[in-house]
Amino acid sequence: MTRYEDLPYRTCVGIALINSEGLVFIGRRAGGIEHVDDAHVWQMPQGGVDPGEDAWEAAKRELYEETSVRSVEKLAEIDDWLTYDIPRTVAGRAWKGRYRGQRQKWFALRFTGTDTEIDVERPGGGVHKAEFISWRWEPMQNLPTLIVPFKRPVYERVVKEFAALAGK
């Protein structure tokens, strides 16, 4: 059995989708192994990078698969890959015990569509499994308090890097 410390990180992307008012999209997760309490169930879209896929293409794909959104303009990306470890108590259940956490490339995207484009209940016209049960626009500076605690340092860095793009 592989020791927790020796497990690799899952390569992923994260998306800060910013609307014309400078607010950021967050989705309410339906629960699962990361669930801590009802105050920490909100997150920005994120997901894995497929083999042979570059991070930018993965970001657009994941955003569509989770929200149905295609109307975006790329504003920025964080140069570094940001990492977080999942708690040891759930490491064996998350991703079938193959990873200790995620290494994420983060993108800031301007949402150029209308709210009617967003569909978290039947993303991609129902082709993709719903990851969120609801969504809202939120001031960027609030995001670290809404995420599960073990992802908080990543969200703090994302806010620091992208705050000016949201006008805050």
From Swiss-Prot:
Signal peptide: none annotated. Its cofactor is a divalent metal cation. Its EC number is 3.6.1.-. GO terms for biological process: nucleoside phosphate metabolic process; ribose phosphate metabolic process. SUPFAM superfamilies: Nudix. Pfam families: NUDIX. It is an enzyme of class 3 (hydrolase). Residues 8-160 form the Nudix hydrolase domain. Gene3D superfamilies: Nucleoside Triphosphate Pyrophosphohydrolase. Keywords: Hydrolase. A motif (Nudix box) lies at residues 47-68. It comes from the Bacteria. One of its GO terms (molecular function) is bis(5'-adenosyl)-pentaphosphatase activity. Belongs to the Nudix hydrolase family. RppH subfamily. Accelerates the degradation of transcripts by removing pyrophosphate from the 5'-end of triphosphorylated RNA, leading to a more labile monophosphorylated state that can stimulate subsequent ribonuclease cleavage. This is RNA pyrophosphohydrolase. It comes from Bradyrhizobium sp. (strain BTAi1 / ATCC BAA-1182). The lineage of its organism: Bacteria, Pseudomonadati, Pseudomonadota, Alphaproteobacteria, Hyphomicrobiales.
